[in-house]
Amino acid sequence: MVTIRLARGGAKKRPFYQVVVTDSRNARDGRFIERVGFFNPIATGSAEGLRLDLDRVSHWVSQGATVSDRVAALIKEAQKAA
């Protein structure tokens, strides 16, 4: 099953997440099909905290991809900001 979820990057105690489309059987930070955005939970000041390609997200959802709970909340936030 294809899913849209977060893949963790960054350093110890400084997380940075890529929003990726991947097969649900792959490891969290493993192989992915497409990168559709990023999320920086500790962004401050003028740093960009969230960027999503909403067109690609809607494309994958229309193809049957499931969305994780956290990514669903981020999509809502991005749609509100757009």
From Swiss-Prot:
Gene designation per UniProt: rpsP
Molecular function in Gene Ontology: structural constituent of ribosome
A Pfam match: Ribosomal_S16
Biological-process GO terms, alphabetical: translation
HAMAP family named in the record: Ribosomal_bS16
Keyword Ribonucleoprotein carried by entry: yes
Annotated source species: Edwardsiella ictaluri (strain 93-146)
Annotated Gene Ontology cellular component terms: cytoplasm; small ribosomal subunit
Keywords per UniProt: Ribonucleoprotein, Ribosomal protein
Keyword rRNA-binding: no
Signal peptide range: none
Protein name (database record): Small ribosomal subunit protein bS16
Similarity section: Belongs to the bacterial ribosomal protein bS16 family.
